[in-house]
Amino acid sequence: MAVSLWQQCIGRLQDELSAQQFSMWIRPLQAEMDGDTLVLYAPNRFVLDWVRDKYINIINQFFTEQMGSDAPKLRFDIGSRPSAPKPIQATAAVVKPKLESSPQKSQTSFNVNAPEPAATANHRSNINPTYQFENFVEGKSNQLGKAAALQVAENPGGAYNPLFLYGGTGLGKTHLLHAVGNGIIKNKPNAKVVYMHSERFVQDMVKALQNNAIEEFKRYYRSVDALFIDDIQFFANKDRSQEEFFHTFNALLEGNHQIILTSDRYPKEIDGVEDRLKSRFGWGLTVAIEPPELETRVAILMRKAQESGINLPDEVAFFIAKRLRSNVRELEGALNRVIANANFTGRPITIDFVREALRDLLALQEKLVTIDNIQKTVAEYYKIKMADMLSKRRSRSVARPRQVAMALSKELTNHSLPEIGDAFGGRDHTTVLHACRKIAQLREESHDTKEDYANLIRTLSS
């Protein structure tokens, strides 16, 4: 009875949560009765803690509404319920559609550019062993992506298939792909895990056509245990490659073999890619990887400095992190330059030294991102007048973009809250603070706001 009640609760949660939240946190749960207690099994500690912190009140409220004082107690545990290996499924709305093709699987390897038989799993896979979950710096900007990647590594071909990670350049998507691959190979050393850039897939297909080896190409790619393709947007306008990948995708999913894809944009926004592919990209879980927030940027710098054997003062790390915001690659490149200059000159790493070592980079960053530039960009994005940013109008169509612009100004510039308020028509600093908190809340609750904010950061940081 209580397990049936949980199925009803799943329906309620599916209605109330975003598709990403539901797929990420609710779909992996398994339920089983233990006396008068309903036990919910989570795949790992991260999911367990998140569900218990965020959704336990909603779940208990639903149980009470349905059964009153007879509502079951609720307990959380990690693992799979003993009586069945599969989770209780959600309603048909989230079930993957029937695949259009199911080519026969084969263990034959593709011959073009094939590795030597004695090659190791890492060499055969192109998986970089240096990219691990342990050295991936986690923050709010990439927390969901890392959690999803961890679950895929533990259970490839399971709930999140395909996993689609998207976001700007240098944010850690490739690191997560390799970390998943290393996790799978660690658990199953003989697993055939293949990582590649999308252009390599295209090149392999072209070579196969030239060498009359297209059947070997098909058998090779459709026989892997896990296929990770980076920058899938480069399939745009390559019709034959899209056709081959379409059938490869179908074959792998039918065999419950894991697929992970990355892109610089949301699947539906990828121009030049067929709708049937874009639709399939969203069958599993789609997660945004956003530019790292200040605390994460500092942590990245401190980790990188530690790996390089350098003692980086906290104030220097904060100085760099506050001024370079676009991506991890830029941060690491700046730190490498600072370290190289320090080693060459023998000078200690201070804020003044960093100002000198990065003067051209810092000058460019300050020139590109100004409050005025943010206001103009946001006004254009939301199709409102620039004057509305400074006006007293409170209609939602104007107030929300203004709040977004204030939040971006706090994140992307070094201006204080009073200075930002002055730039928005002489508003008080408390108004700016309220706007920042409101937008932070909406980014957690609203997929549209999260997307808008990420798009604007990419535009302003490019």
From Swiss-Prot:
Name the record gives this protein: Chromosomal replication initiator protein DnaA
Keyword terms of this UniProt record: ATP-binding, Cytoplasm, DNA replication, DNA-binding, Lipid-binding, Nucleotide-binding
Region named Domain I, interacts with DnaA modulators: 1-84
UniProt similarity note: Belongs to the DnaA family.
Cited HAMAP family: DnaA_bact
Record's GO cellular component terms: cytoplasm; plasma membrane
Residue ranges of the region described as Domain IV, binds dsDNA: 343-462
SMART domains linked to this entry: AAA, Bac_DnaA_C
